[in-house]
Amino acid sequence: MPPVVLIIESRKEVAAALEAAIEASNFTPITVPYLESLADIPHPIAAIVVRVAFEGVGEPAHAAIAKLPRNHPPVVAIAWEENELAEARRLKCEVVLHAPHDITRLRETLTKLVGT
């Protein structure tokens, strides 16, 4: 099985687009709308992709990043607005892609992080 990339994304259409991009990069995507614990995922995770966004009500999906253990897999954050970019930096994501222009770097970024 190719390395598993966990996608934390609550919007189905965004999740589907990320899944397609990750599959095209020869990784196995697993998508969850929110994450309580990495132990909930039945496979070893090589990297995490999360869209940082403040939309809707309740806790945003990206809030799960703050609750991860110290030894968590590398996190690639995708953000559009300045406040979202700042939030990704606050969460100490290993890579922050500024959408839409940095999205083309997702494949290259995952390959570098995962090492395949």
Description of each model-found segment:
Residues 79-97:
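Alpha4 helix (beta4-alpha4-beta5 surface) of REC/receiver domains from two-component response regulators
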Residues 15, 36, 45-68, 81:
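Conserved phosphotransfer microenvironments
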Residues 2-12, 18-22, 48:
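Conserved acidic segment of CheY-like receiver
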Residues 25, 71, 90-93:
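Short, structured coil segments at secondary-structure junctions
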Residues 111-116:
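The C-terminal output helix
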Residues 26-36:
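Short hydrophobic/Thr-rich beta-strand motif most characteristic of the beta2 strand and flanking loop
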Residues 101-110:
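C-terminal output helix
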Residues 68-76:
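His-Asp phosphorelay/catalytic-motif detector in bacterial-type signaling
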